[in-house]
């Protein structure tokens, strides 16, 4: 689902991670927060709701969208029950799908079997291994919808944060940053473990989204992000900063 902070203010989604090409990958997101002005904008937004936000982890990139049936056309999304995180729920809803709240990986195989879910994007490589969904979700559409993965945050109550010394605040920030670094290392290691466990299995069949579906998802993602930006002036400032940094990253990759 969207999470409590998104419900408090839609612009919090900009810090958690955006779907498709609208989003920054984990290193770029950290760069925007650390030196691109993102943390100051996040601090301002968090202060309105009484907390100081810190980066404290990341899921790593998504393996893709696991599906038990074909999702080759936009029409095939219609009525499909799809588990996705964050504002990707609004993206699949735009294609006529029914977003499903996060199901525990241990229950996901049963959810596929009884029709509670038809497709799921699992963030974290070991979630796939522990869920055992491969025989039921035989198609893996990569890179998925939240291809860049999602940031995990730590919120410190603002009165507590303001009472801390500068040194204590620096310790908190350093520990949170180290957790972020370790989480990315874990995600990379877990992806290798997951690949080894999977071995030369028949399933899943790895597929790219069709041009029709990719275009529909991209258009929906742009619309959803623009709706967030239109919430209020604070959301517009966050959006413009994020997208300007995304543009710089794109130019750097081309160069």
PLM segments and residue spans:
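N-terminal secretory/targeting leader peptides
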Residues: 1-28, 44-255
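Soluble or luminal CAZymes and related metallo-dependent hydrolases
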Residues: 33-37, 187-190
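Hinge/lid segment of periplasmic solute-binding proteins
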Residues: 34-48
